[in-house]
Amino acid sequence: MEIPLINGFYFYVLRCADNTLYGGYTINLINRVERHNKGQGAKYTKARRPVQLIYFESFDNQHDAMSAEYQFKQRTRSSKIKFLKKNGISLTNLK
């Protein structure tokens, strides 16, 4: 997966070491994933390192990116997996 080098508004999904999924929002994708892996990200991912970026989507504005994050977090686990598969993400070994 090629990560964009420019800042923007991004919704992203991480696969944690325990095979759980975490959705977030950022303006700097590379920095945010690095921070998650250093234990400086969300409390949820701090105990589930390392994390792997498996999906991201860019938006024109902060509101839309944050809305995508909110909608993802409201989904059930099975719905999150369906969303990722629909967007071309192949998931194996997920609990």
Swiss-Prot record:
Q: What is this protein called?
A: UPF0213 protein PEPE_0875
A Pfam short name: GIY-YIG
Every GIY-YIG domain range: 7-82
Q: Which family does the record claim for this protein?
A: Belongs to the UPF0213 family.
